[in-house]
Amino acid sequence: MTEKTINNIVWWIPFRKLRDSVREVLYSIMDINNSTKNSLEITIMIKTIYKVITEKYYNENYMYSCKLGGIDFKFYDSIFSGTLELVFSEMGSYNFDSINFKDGDVVIDIGGNVGMVSLYLAKKYPFLKIYAFEPVKQNYENFLKNIELNNINKDIIKVFNLAITKDRRDVILTSPFNNSGGSNIYDYHICSKILNNSSIGKSITFDDIFTNNNISKCKLLKIDCEGAEYEILYSANVENLKNCEYMRGEFHGIENKREKLYNYCNKYIKHIEIVYSNDNYSL
């Protein structure tokens, strides 16, 4: 392992103090490079390094500040993650202001991450009832912290540490090392060498959301769940889809599959605005 390799590993870490700390750890094990004879050994070494770094700094957060709709917000996220900046840049495309929210309207947020969408809606429309689902434990815990950090009434948002699937199975969640919002249940980040350790999570179905929470009408379904939208929406009872008035979110995968899913949902949900992800995953 060379100095250039070390710099390539740490360049993306957003905080200098942490970046320098990680660099020192890597310098201390540079001699490992002398014993590596092939690319497989190097790959194993790199994965081991990332595992050590992750375990050491797993519970470290940073605070992200932004203004949404003229309202000031602060959010905790994993110290390695750049997700909040990305979500912030996407907020305008969701066009929430076009929705005529009324007292008691229900919002379902599938793929809540650390809460940026749900907290924005709760702050701007405090008369809503929001049900948010986030399967990654660290994201879920930061979501709860962010509710308190932004002085949101806890009665507005109910957060569940659950994935949504077609069959309530336990899921294995794989997360990119530097993207807390990129966790998925299909392990399709195959090109990344910066994967966190996988974790196991529980799941319920889309229809369970309605049944378990006595929901008859959903004003807004927001969905951004890294490819799980296909099994979630295709397996949903069409009556529950019909009971969703608006849908906002992101579809992943190859273009023809995204358009097919959009057309399917458009048969049942009146108002849909979807962002197509630029990823190339063959979902």
Segments from the language model and where they lie:
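Conserved SAM-binding strand-loop segment of SAM-dependent methyltransferases
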Residues: N153-N161
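Short, hinge-like loop/turn segments at secondary-structure boundaries
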Residues: E148-N150, T174-N179, E239, C265
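S-adenosyl-L-methionine
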Residues: M1-F127, Y131-V136, E141-K145, N151-N153, ...
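Feature marks short, surface-exposed loop/turn motifs that line or immediately flank catalytic pockets
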Residues: N139, K166-R168, E229, E255
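Active-site segment flanking the S-adenosylmethionine/decSAM binding pocket
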Residues: N100, V106-S118, Y125, G182, ...
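Residues at the starts of beta-strands that form the adenosine-phosphate
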Residues: K129, I156, Y246
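Glycine-rich adenosyl-binding loop in Rossmann-like folds that engage adenosine-containing cofactors
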Residues: G70-I99, F160-D208, N212
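Hydrophobic packing residues within well-ordered alpha-helices of enzyme cores
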Residues: L121, F143, I147, V171-L173, ...
